[in-house]
Amino acid sequence: MQQNEPPPQAMQPASPTQLPAALVREFDGEHLEARLADAVHLSTVGEDGWPHGAQLSAGEILAVNATTLLIAIWPQSSTTANLARDGRLTLSLVHDGALLEIRARSHAVAQRQTALGLSVFRVEIESVIEHRAKYAEVLSGVTFRLYEPAQVLSRWREQIAMLRTFA
């Protein structure tokens, strides 16, 4: 950053407690094939008090509405243990040229779902913070390449259908 440039700012979106409508549509579980490479960063609080990071794919997250999400995660993961113990989480993703930080609380609603035995958590959004710099835009977040996209897409569709039963 040069001396005459303003510092980056955390700005509030139109509603500081709701997802933007475009994100609700992105996480409606419909156009999964368009989101094969996208990841959402999920941070929880580890038992040791330190942040613990994980990634969610489009097939593991469903927007019920602008304030509630459902997520499907591996049952034996540190993330599942952290959410069961503490419930607090932050989702981070790129949207509209900015980084969104979504703070939320969660609670378990089901275990051993689908053939993979996934755990399902309901996520209630408490705040949405938009981090946007006047001098730059965020172009992308975490992305990945699937080795077997057709197989994964089929599994994601099954997972989204399962999540919808809890909506």
Q: Where are the model-predicted features located?
A:
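Binding-site signature for planar aromatic cofactors or substrates
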Residues: 1-167
